[in-house]
């Protein structure tokens, strides 16, 4: 299946605890249909001290979110949009915003 959401895209969360939050996709995990988004689904990880130089503590990091709970933000209109695909005259397959019909640069 083609990737509708890619690293670097701006997305909005459409359901779940963080509904309405926007962020940049940091990493996509296609095997699990999940993506890590900056500032969304922040989880606390408790770390034990590791040796003399590294103290323990609580570290916050983003947890993966299901791709079905994310919607791409159209760069032209700055609104959430569904994503389609179009094959250009030169044979390249590109992502297209369904709302505006604009090609989404990758």
Swiss-Prot record:
Any one annotated GO CC term: ribonucleoprotein complex
Pfam families found in the cross-reference section: KOW, ribosomal_L24
Keywords, in A-Z order: Ribonucleoprotein, Ribosomal protein, RNA-binding, rRNA-binding
Gene3D superfamilies: 2.30.30.30
The organism's place on the tree of life at top rank: Bacteria
GO process annotations (BP): translation
UniProt-listed CDD domains: KOW_RPL26
Alphabetized GO MF terms: rRNA binding; structural constituent of ribosome
Lyase as UniProt keyword: no
Listed HAMAP family: Ribosomal_uL24_B
PANTHER family (UniProt xref): MITOCHONDRIAL RIBOSOMAL PROTEIN L24 (PTHR12903)
Biological role stated in the UniProt entry: One of two assembly initiator proteins, it binds directly to the 5'-end of the 23S rRNA, where it nucleates assembly of the 50S subunit. One of the proteins that surrounds the polypeptide exit tunnel on the outside of the subunit.
Record text on subunit structure and interactions: Part of the 50S ribosomal subunit.
Entry similarity comment: Belongs to the universal ribosomal protein uL24 family.
Name used for this protein in its record: Large ribosomal subunit protein uL24
